[in-house]
Amino acid sequence: MTDSSRVSIATSTIVCVEAEIKGEVIIKEGCVVHPHVVFDATNGPIYVGENNIFEEFAVIRNNSEGQPMIIGDSNIFQVHSKCSAKYVGSRNVIGVHAHLEDGCSVSDDCSIGPKCRVFSKQNLEPSVAVYGPSNSHRITSTPNLTPTLQLEFLRKILPSYHHLYNKKKVTAAQ
């Protein structure tokens, strides 16, 4: 981790030391950050809500000059996913090798399939599934669930096999 004075990690959040965090990043309660995840906030801050899962090699990069990237609660960023979106709501699943391009916005309860893209400046409405090689869209009928059991399991198992970052509690002023 570089520039730790601008990084705030809540006490109940698990961040493996192999993760890379640059710039102003605030990660709230209950998140799990796997090894080799990259948070790059060198161009603007990244604010992460509660109970998100960032799997191995996920890249979260704010490419907007000075504008914050906001990630809501209970999202899953799967292995090798990339996110440069300006906003990601809550309860979204970003699939393996999926890519949220610069400036796009993802609402709540969306599912982005493996290797799918949400293109620059595109705004997804709630409950949209993006799937297939042509990035087809459809509205889903059921909302995504909060990954409670997965979070509980990861919070127990990751500390047994990985070193974790020391954390600073997120204060109310932030």
From Swiss-Prot:
Function per UniProt: Part of the dynactin complex that activates the molecular motor dynein for ultra-processive transport along microtubules.
The places in or outside the cell where this protein is found are: Cytoplasm, Cytoskeleton
The name this protein carries in UniProt is Dynactin subunit 6
The opening ranks of the lineage are: Eukaryota, Metazoa, Ecdysozoa, Nematoda, Chromadorea
Q: Which gene encodes it?
A: dnc-6
List, in alphabetical order, the GO biological process terms annotated in this UniProt record: mitotic spindle organization
Alphabetized GO MF terms:
dynein complex binding
Coiled coil ranges: none
- GO cellular component terms listed in the entry, alphabetical order: cytoplasm; dynactin complex
Tell me how this protein assembles.
Answer: Subunit of dynactin, a multiprotein complex part of a tripartite complex with dynein and a adapter, such as BICDL1, BICD2 or HOOK3. The dynactin complex is built around ACTR1A/ACTB filament and consists of an actin-related filament composed of a shoulder domain, a pointed end and a barbed end.
Keyword terms: Cytoplasm, Cytoskeleton
Regarding protein family, the annotation reads:
Belongs to the dynactin subunits 5/6 family. Dynactin subunit 6 subfamily.
Q: Which organism is it from?
A: Caenorhabditis briggsae
| Listed InterPro entries | DCTN6, Trimer_LpxA-like_sf
